[in-house]
Regions:
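Short hydrophobic/aromatic beta-strand or adjacent loop that forms the aromatic wall/cage
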Residues: 46, 148-152
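Conserved acetyl-CoA-binding loop-helix of GNAT-fold acetyltransferases
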Residues: 86-100, 122-127
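Conserved catalytic-core motifs of GNAT/GCN5-like acyltransferases
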Residues: 111-114, 131-148
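Conserved active-site tyrosine of GNAT-family acetyltransferases
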Residues: 125, 130, 153
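Short glycine/proline-centered loop/turn elements that form peptide/ligand docking sites
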Residues: 90, 94, 118-121, 138-143
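Hydrophobic pocket/interface hotspot
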Residues: 18-19, 76
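Conserved N-terminal entry element of GNAT/NAT acetyltransferase domains
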Residues: 1-14, 30, 151, 155-162
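Acetyl-CoA-dependent GNAT
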Residues: 10, 30-85, 91, 100, ...
Length: 162
């Protein structure tokens, strides 16, 4: 999948060290927790794609599909290395994946669930067209062991701006 500045592609063996290093960066670890060895090889929730910028691993984006025809939805999540943040690459990566999931995979509803305190991520998702649905209290355990709230956000295919 191609964007104007990036490509989303499958994970290759040579990507694992770079992805592991990104997951260990303080600004990524804050929201994703400590990297687990199998997270990058076999994520437990869907397909993992590398965010590739001119051959460099900038981060990863993953999605999990609900293929039941009564639902046709998918959840998305991503992480971007600290040195790649603030350039609109997260927004572009989410937009590329949204287009694929709606136009190629036929999903009618997409969700994402950033931490309520992750304002940068929330702005990114809103810029793509995700809307706030509600707060999920004590949704996820933070790296320091405390619980934090998550924000459920959704994007519906019929309201998406292509």
């Amino acid at each position: 999948m191609e964007g104007s500045r990036l490509r989303l592609r499958g994970v290759e063996a040579g990507d694992l060290a770079a992805l592991g290093a990104i997951r260990a960066e303080p600004g990524v670890r804050e929201w994703w927790g400590d990297p687990q060895p199998d997270d990058l090889v076999a994520p437990d929730d869907g397909d993992l794609l590398v965010i590739d910028v001119n051959g460099a691993v900038a981060g990863a984006i993953q999605y999990e599909e609900v293929t039941d025809p009564q639902y046709r939805s998918a959840g998305i999540d991503l992480f971007l290395g600290e040195s790649w943040q603030g350039r609109g690459l997260g927004r572009e990566a989410v937009g590329v994946l949204v287009r694929h999931l709606i136009e190629s995979r036929g999903h009618h509803r997409l969700t994402i669930d950033p931490a309520v305190a992750n304002e940068r991520a929330i702005r990114c998702y809103e810029a793509v067209g995700f809307a706030r649905v509600g707060v999920m209290r004590q949704y996820e355990r933070a790296a320091d062991g405390s619980w934090h709230d998550g924000l459920l956000m959704e994007l519906l295919a019929d309201t998406w701006r292509a």
